[in-house]
Amino acid sequence: MMGDNEGRRTPLLNLGVQVSMRVLIIGAAMASMWVMITNREVASVYGIAFEAKYSYSSAFRYLVYAQIAVCAATLFTLVWACLAVRRRGLVFALFFFDLLTTLTAISAFSAAFAEGYVGKYGNKQAGWLPICGYVHVYCSRVTISLAMSFASFVLLFILTVLTASSARHY
């Protein structure tokens, strides 16, 4: 009797962890996306006004689109995880989708981080000056967005490892 209950509790506990992690991932990705989309600042340098917006940077646009994809894929796999409890053959496909989502998240974070680094510190060899001295709020919000993006990546990475472990047992 005890063995039957123990065998049933493990998949339900696994499902609870899967659902919780996926909800946290969606929240972090949406927060990152929202902060980046609403980020805008106008500054004046030597009497010339310029605007800093996420849409002016291809790396920041990629981050936003990738976060949309992460949210959509994680929402899809949230439903998939619930189905995988009943049909164990779906667990490997779940792992595969989690892996692709994780790779998308880290590639977008890396591209946006590189752009943010150049914006903050410049690149003397290329002649690019840092802009964060002029648009403090914009750079601070980019940092917050990148932190949330990295959090979603870390959660996705942990989830992918957990899903791989679950797939091994089936």
Swiss-Prot record:
InterPro entries: CASP/CASPL, CASP_dom, CASPL. It is found in: Cell membrane. PANTHER family: CASP-LIKE PROTEIN 1U1 (PTHR36488:SF8). It is a multi-pass membrane protein. This is CASP-like protein 1F1. Homodimer and heterodimers. The chain crosses the membrane at residues 17-37, 63-83, 89-109, 142-162. Keywords: Cell membrane, Membrane, Transmembrane, Transmembrane helix. Belongs to the Casparian strip membrane proteins (CASP) family. It comes from Arabidopsis lyrata subsp. lyrata. Residues 1-16, 84-88, 163-170 are cytoplasmic.
